[in-house]
């Protein structure tokens, strides 16, 4: 996987340098004003997670991929160097500016990469949103994707919304399709580390079925019980891959990434 990540990162770096030299190619990086909202190092994290999609989810170059909460194309850009002309990418996000940038700079060069705005309410990121998460239906047909992934999305959502999204993920996945989602999972080990002051987030405020770092702005970071997450996956026919890939946020070592990663496969219906 390290070879895949290194190759994808070099592809992004080469394209971004080319964009700076020629006054803005079709694959230049988005402005800092858009990159600041995705968290983490834009190029490095994008290449890192595409490596996970390939290595942990078995993503093939000719498959169809859905990126939920795609932002300004952090995952889409490295995927342009992996998916072939038979492959297909779709992404949606609440940020109109981010989607406009992706359409102008990515879709224009890669027509098999499509982006849509989803006007979903979020108290922090889209307070004027038209739709509630619980009412939002992913704008895609049933069984239309081989892989669905979400990074740093469920870490900002309440349990009922997460459950609804996992239902939608199961709906749009083909039988045998895979999903990758990141979380802050609360279990005996992570809770012990929190109590000992070892974790990056203290999750000291309790809500109904979750914990948060900020009482007045709970969606800033939300931790979910691992038992709840596992139950919901089972409810919607998503078989969790074992072991889970716990992250370093809680003070665990060794770790794969910062957040906890859950991989699952949709069982045949």
UniProtKB/Swiss-Prot annotation:
Keywords: Methyltransferase, Transferase. SUPFAM superfamilies: S-adenosyl-L-methionine-dependent methyltransferases (SSF53335). The lineage of its organism: Bacteria, Bacillati, Actinomycetota, Actinomycetes, Mycobacteriales. PANTHER family: METHYLTRANSFERASE, UNCHARACTERISED METHYLTRANSFERASE RV1498C. One of its GO terms (molecular function) is S-adenosylmethionine-dependent methyltransferase activity. Belongs to the methyltransferase superfamily. The keyword Nucleotide-binding does not apply. Its EC number is 2.1.1.-. GO terms for biological process: methylation. This is Uncharacterised methyltransferase Rv1498c. Disulfide bonds: none annotated.
């Amino acid at each position: 996987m390290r070879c895949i990540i290194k190759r994808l990162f070099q592809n992004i770096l080469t394209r971004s340098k080319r964009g700076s030299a020629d006054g803005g190619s079709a694959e230049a990086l988005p402005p800092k004003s858009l990159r600041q909202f995705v968290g983490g190092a834009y190029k490095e994290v994008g290449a890192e997670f595409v490596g996970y999609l390939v290595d942990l989810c078995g993503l093939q170059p000719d498959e169809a991929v859905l990126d939920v909460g795609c932002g300004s194309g952090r995952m889409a850009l490295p995927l342009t160097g992996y998916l072939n002309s038979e492959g297909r990418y779709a992404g949606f996000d609440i940020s109109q500016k981010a989607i406009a940038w992706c359409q102008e700079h990515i879709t224009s060069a890669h027509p098999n990469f499509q982006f849509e705005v989803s006007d979903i309410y979020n108290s922090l990121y889209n307070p004027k949103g038209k739709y509630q998460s619980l009412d939002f239906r992913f704008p895609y047909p049933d069984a239309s994707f081989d892989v669905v992934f979400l990074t740093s999305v469920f870490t900002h959502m309440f349990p009922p919304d997460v459950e609804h999204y996992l239902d939608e993920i199961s709906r749009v996945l083909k039988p045998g399709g895979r999903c990758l989602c990141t979380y802050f999972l609360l279990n005996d080990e992570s809770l012990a580390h929190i109590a000992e002051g070892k974790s990056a987030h203290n999750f000291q405020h309790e809500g109904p079925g979750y914990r948060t770092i900020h009482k007045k702005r709970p969606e800033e970071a939300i931790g979910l019980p691992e038992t709840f997450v596992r139950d919901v996956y089972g409810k919607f026919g998503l078989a969790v891959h074992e072991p889970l890939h716990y992250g370093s946020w809680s003070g665990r070592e060794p770790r794969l990434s910062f957040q906890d990663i859950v991989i699952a496969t949709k069982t045949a219906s």
